[in-house]
Amino acid sequence: MSTYTRPVMLLLSGLLLLTLAIAVLNTLVPLWLAQEHMSTWQVGVVSSSYFTGNLVGTLLTGYVIKRIGFNRSYYLASFIFAAGCAGLGLMIGFWSWLAWRFVAGIGCAMIWVVVESALMCSGTSRNRGRLLAAYMMVYYVGTFLGQLLVSKVSTELMSVLPWVTGLTLAGILPLLFTHVLNQQAENHDSTSITSMLKLRQARLGVNGCIISGIVLGSLYGLMPLYLNHKGVSNASIGFWMAVLVSAGILGQWPIGRLADKFGRLLVLRVQVFVVILGSIAMLSQAAMAPALFILGAAGFTLYPVAMAWACEKVEHHQLVAMNQALLLSYTVGSLLGPSFTAMLMQNFSDNLLFIMIASVSFIYLLMLLRNAGHTPKPVAHV
């Protein structure tokens, strides 16, 4: 059976449109708040409201999928996010935007859980690595194109909201032409997220998602600050961030393919080791382009491989709950990692960014090496 079936391709097509809208709003909302002369702490609180919505959406989506299936859950998530977009134009103010960004955060997380769970349920242990690699490629390409749109079109609030909301609703259209089967057996009891987090044989995958959140959250949030403190111009910062993200895009498919062929344990070990090497290269003031490229190629591909590892350890009817647990783990890592790293950078040195990334990666590498004898190795498929 083909890996990229018609439902998968249509699902990813819709996701691309949604990711464009998400990327544009995530970039412009802080700028719009600043234009309204809101203080830094207010901008931060609105941002936190969005991520709080992410957590709530992640926890709710499993129940929604079980009740109404993948297609209707996807439609509902898209409508919720569209409401969060349109609501920003109803009233401009701190409390209003706090509420609407919370709504948008719920919708955004629901979209992620629905798409990731649908891909997991559509695939097998032979091709889940490639499916998740395709998902991450679409996500990063959409994010990149969203940034490009921001630089090319008017960024006025009432100019952006109509087409961003329209883009979100257009993301529903591809799913109208297919039906993504929810193959969770109805005679199975609901699986709790907590039980998935405690599942011993999937712990390396869960830990990998936490580490991935720490690494990517720190790179996304603090790399521009690191470069700025090094005297790099804003234009050049954009270039170096593009190098980082492009490496992540280019690395998705080959690493997903290798994980499917040679087993996820081996690939995870190599990835984490390369992240450590990339961090050391940045600390040693080596050529920035190759250092950032290998850091991006390895760091940005940790999440899908760790997710595929965890999902092959559970029964088919547990996949949605496991995916919720993994996304929750990633979100927690992406929230805590940058906060802790930023405090270290402020109090000691900017180099703590890469020391932190290398340190958590080294801890995860030790887990991968130590648990090899206790955790069954994923079966390699030619």
Swiss-Prot record:
InterPro entries: MFS, MFS_dom, MFS_trans_sf, MFS_YcaD, MFS_YcaD-like
The name this protein goes by in its record: Uncharacterized MFS-type transporter YcaD
Family membership: Belongs to the major facilitator superfamily. YcaD (TC 2.A.1.26) family.
Residue intervals annotated with topology Periplasmic: 35-44, 100-101, 152-156, 225-234, 346-347
HAMAP family referenced in this protein's UniProt entry, alphabetically: MFS_YcaD (MF_01149)
Pfam family of the protein (one): MFS_1
Molecular function (Gene Ontology), one example: transmembrane transporter activity
GO cellular-component term (any): plasma membrane
Keywords: Cell inner membrane, Cell membrane, Membrane, Transmembrane, Transmembrane helix, Transport
Record's subcellular location: Cell inner membrane
Ranges in the topological domain labelled Cytoplasmic: 1-13, 66-78, 123-130, 178-203, 256-269, 312-324, 369-382
Coiled coil: none
Main location: membrane
Cross-referenced CDD domains: MFS_YcaD_like
Residues annotated as transmembrane: 14-34, 45-65, 79-99, 102-122, 131-151, 157-177, 204-224, 235-255, 270-290, 291-311, 325-345, 348-368
Database matches in NCBIfam families: PRK03633.1
SUPFAM superfamilies tied to this protein: MFS general substrate transporter (SSF103473)
Membrane topology: Multi-pass membrane protein
Domain of life of the native organism: Bacteria
